[in-house]
């Protein structure tokens, strides 16, 4: 298996310097995502919306930077994550959306719709083969993600 390329940026912002959303767009270009044909295609942007009451998630304006990039390249973006199998604020699509909104992820703040990828109860998924998987032979992927 080929090693993945990992791109880094300095999280510090200096006076009159680029902020993180601008740096994120530069990373997207460096990674070659602009070379993909996104024109007219649904683009699932997978991220973690955070649990209710915590701060361990990316800020919504970072998601918006990716959304703007996808739109500028003709794509139809939506933010997505799948429900959890454990109890909490993301165990079904309704509570998951309320959690996302509470943490600042709304269509107005991120610039695109938010879809929970595996449906209302987390049962709308597709089995996808894991090619070359030594221990795992298939993965369940949310249908909305697969449809994109």
Model-derived segments and spans:
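N-terminal and secondary-structure boundary signal
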Residues: 1-148
């Amino acid at each position: 298996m080929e090693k993945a390329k990992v791109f880094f940026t300095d999280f510090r912002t200096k006076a009159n310097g680029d902020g993180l959303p601008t740096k994120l767009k530069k990373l997207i270009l460096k990674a070659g995502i602009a070379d993909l044909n996104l024109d007219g295609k649904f683009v699932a942007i997978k991220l973690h919306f955070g649990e209710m009451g915590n701060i361990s998630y990316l800020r919504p304006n970072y998601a918006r930077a990716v959304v703007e990039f996808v739109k500028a390249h003709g794509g139809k973006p939506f933010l997505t994550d799948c429900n959890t199998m454990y109890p909490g604020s993301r165990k079904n699509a309704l509570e998951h959306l309320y959690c996302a909104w509470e943490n600042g992820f709304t269509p107005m703040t991120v610039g695109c719709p938010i879809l929970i990828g595996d449906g209302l109860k987390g049962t709308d998924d597709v089995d996808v083969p894991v090619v070359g998987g030594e221990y795992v032979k298939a993965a369940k992927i949310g249908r909305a993600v697969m449809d994109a």
